[in-house]
């Protein structure tokens, strides 16, 4: 019974993705507690996201030129923390995809190299067989020439 290779890399990637959610939640909680993190990491992307979202909604509804009020600090911090958490999960997922792609590319490259090596080996064997065939053909011609040059043996009855 042949047992296939255990896909340890895929299991590892799945584990990393599952661990990324609690890590993202802890980072979000830390972002809510830290003033520096809140003011410089969470608030600017949250306000930008809010501005873009509201501007898009206003344009879809047909309102032009209306001013958009910024979010209050607590709502912006919460939205920024959520955006940060989603970005972390997205980056980890993207990293897993890149690693899987590179692993698959390495496997494909290895298989192509093995195939090229096999083809080269077969070509070498074919060349050797052609040389052997030519040698045997020359020997057969030599034997035929010698047979034809022998005097005919008298038949005895």
Swiss-Prot record:
Origin superkingdom: Eukaryota
Keywords: Coiled coil, Mitochondrion
Intracellular or extracellular location(s): Mitochondrion
Signal peptide (UniProt feature, chain positions): none
GO CC term, one of those recorded: mitochondrion
Coiled-coil segments: 103-129
Matches recorded under InterPro entries: OPA3-like (IPR010754)
Principal localisation: mitochondrion
GO biological process: locomotory behavior; musculoskeletal movement; regulation of buoyancy; regulation of lipid metabolic process
Function: May play some role in mitochondrial processes.
Similarity-based family: Belongs to the OPA3 family.
Protein name (record): Optic atrophy 3 protein homolog
């Amino acid at each position: 019974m042949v047992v296939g290779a255990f896909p340890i890399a895929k299991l590892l990637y799945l584990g990393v993705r599952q661990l990324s959610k609690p890590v993202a939640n802890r980072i979000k909680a830390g972002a809510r507690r830290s003033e520096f993190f809140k003011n410089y990491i969470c608030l600017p992307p949250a306000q930008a996201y809010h501005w873009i979202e509201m501007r898009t909604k206003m344009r879809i509804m047909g309102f032009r030129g209306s001013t958009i009020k910024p979010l209050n600090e607590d709502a912006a911090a919460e939205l920024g923390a959520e955006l940060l958490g989603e970005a972390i999960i997205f980056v980890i997922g993207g990293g897993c995809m890149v690693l899987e792609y590179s692993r698959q590319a390495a496997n494909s490259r290895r298989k192509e190299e093995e195939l090229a090596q096999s083809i080269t080996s077969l070509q070498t064997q074919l060349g050797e067989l052609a040389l052997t065939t030519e040698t045997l053909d020359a020997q057969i011609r030599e034997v035929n020439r010698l047979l034809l040059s022998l005097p005919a043996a008298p038949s005895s009855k």
